């Protein structure tokens, strides 16, 4: 019999809590990640007021220096710790896959200086369209169409860009490059990026409409991902007939593997929380696992090194946390964590190699306190333990610590 009928895992994308032990093996603009600290530096430089996460125990998580504006609770309402990454990567897919029990020993490739000429030339030859070379770099999806959409409307050239994650994205105005053609080009790009030196996690079609200065990305986005190389705990749950619900980009990250209810993409963190609340309220969701990703911290503020915006985004989540707690049933478990760091005060614009926080709350808790520091995959091991299924590759359950 399951200890908890339902477990809700919420990933605050990029909300790290201090440099990992191996952080100096990872760099940002040539600077090792060893001094990175997403929550610590936000708290120190612009202040952080997250009373609802603090009540659960955010300020109790062991650190060399306590979070400056998040006090430890003498009697928290839940359990807290921090978790270390084992896998050799600091991207979204690696973090999420490890959370679900995989050890990624060969990380995906990322292209901070843009894609090599060989890839662009192959796409040009296949499509019969030129590629705008100036867009070939890590770019905001809205900024890239603002900057190059007018040119695409005039010339029909392809807008190909990337991000901090191992993705190749192709933006195309629907009136200039029809959807069927865009999808066909993306399928070709997928076929040539399945092995090194260009092993990419996703190819993303990014269609848009409108006029210069007023472009809008449409819902016709399409992700061509790769499935995890080994069954995750999501697969184990699915095989056991236990419902799994994905909110936000979770379904894309796992290429649908092990997920039987995709609740759709988020338009924003707030929209994602709305979707989570809707999911939690489903009458048919009596037992199972929901997995939510809230990406605005990372996409809108971390990469853009906007500490004030990042702080405000954390405040907005914290203000809505009571709604999530109110939607919980007596035997629900809520786990709040992250997938990597992205210190908005740090060098460069890439993710940072950090510990991730873990907060655990349930209305059924009789106790509280700290869980021993562990690893990302301990989350999935705990989920597996609760529902009586096998773990994946790695992870140690902390279920017995939650009382």
From Swiss-Prot:
Q: In the UniProt record, does the keyword Ion transport occur?
A: no
Spell out the subcellular localization from the entry: Cytoplasm
Task: Tell me yes or no: is Phosphoprotein among this UniProt entry's keywords.
Answer: no
Give the cofactors, semicolon-separated: Mn(2+)
E.C. no: 5.4.2.7
Q: What reaction is this protein's catalytic activity?
A: 2-deoxy-alpha-D-ribose 1-phosphate = 2-deoxy-D-ribose 5-phosphate; alpha-D-ribose 1-phosphate = D-ribose 5-phosphate
**Superkingdom, taxonomy of origin:** Bacteria
Annotated pathway:
Carbohydrate degradation; 2-deoxy-D-ribose 1-phosphate degradation; D-glyceraldehyde 3-phosphate and acetaldehyde from 2-deoxy-alpha-D-ribose 1-phosphate: step 1/2
Entries under Pfam families matching the protein:
Metalloenzyme
Which Gene3D superfamilies does the record cross-reference, listed alphabetically?
Answer: Alkaline Phosphatase, subunit A, Phosphopentomutase
- Alphabetically, which GO biological process terms does the record hold? 2-deoxyribose 1-phosphate catabolic process; 5-phosphoribose 1-diphosphate biosynthetic process; metabolic compound salvage; nucleotide metabolic process
Cellular component GO terms held in the UniProt record: cytosol
Q: Name one GO molecular function term.
A: magnesium ion binding
What does this gene product do? Isomerase that catalyzes the conversion of deoxy-ribose 1-phosphate (dRib-1-P) and ribose 1-phosphate (Rib-1-P) to deoxy-ribose 5-phosphate (dRib-5-P) and ribose 5-phosphate (Rib-5-P), respectively.
Please give the name of this protein: Phosphopentomutase
Look up and give the organism this protein is from.
Answer: Streptococcus pneumoniae serotype 4 (strain ATCC BAA-334 / TIGR4)
